From Swiss-Prot:
Subunit structure: Homodimer.
DNA-binding region residue numbers: 75-94
Residue stretches in coiled coil: none
Protein name stated in the entry: DNA-binding protein Fis
UniProt xrefs under InterPro entries: Fis_DNA-bd, Homeodomain-like_sf, HTH_Fis, Trans_regulatory_Fis
Gene3D superfamilies: Homeodomain-like (1.10.10.60)
GO MF, one annotated term: DNA-binding transcription factor activity
Species annotation: Tolumonas auensis (strain DSM 9187 / NBRC 110442 / TA 4)
Pfam families noted in UniProt: HTH_8
Family: Belongs to the transcriptional regulatory Fis family.
Task of the protein: Activates ribosomal RNA transcription. Plays a direct role in upstream activation of rRNA promoters.
Keyword Transcription regulation: yes
Keywords from the named record: Activator, DNA-binding, Transcription, Transcription regulation
Length: 99
């Protein structure tokens, strides 16, 4: 089997530069950080509950969707790709209504 290691450098998003309107790629991590900064700035100092779960679901649900498409619904293959148990994958799919 071919060992395919995904590095964080491969997880990039494309955004449009505000001044030049040219597409710019940046790591997914930067996009998540910026989204969190924007979200917290809109709170104007108010407390928020369950932020961790909210952020996790915003990332996890689309990831599951794309991986299940990529594996053509093969849960065993998807679980291996994600490095999780197939039972855990099934629970996550059910949680997001993807079963």
């Amino acid at each position: 089997m071919l060992d395919q290691t995904l590095t964080s450098e491969a997880l990039v998003t494309t955004v449009t530069h505000a001044q030049t309107h040219q597409p710019v790629q940046r790591p997914l991590r930067d996009s998540v950080q910026q989204a969190l900064r924007n979200y917290l700035a809109q709170l104007n100092g108010q407390d928020v509950a369950e932020l961790y779960d909210m952020v996790l679901s915003e990332v996890e649900a689309p990831m599951l969707d794309i991986i299940m498409q990529y594996t053509r619904g093969n849960q065993t293959r998807a679980a291996i790709m994600m490095g999780i148990n197939r039972g855990t994958l099934r629970k996550k799919l059910k949680k997001y209504g993807m079963n």
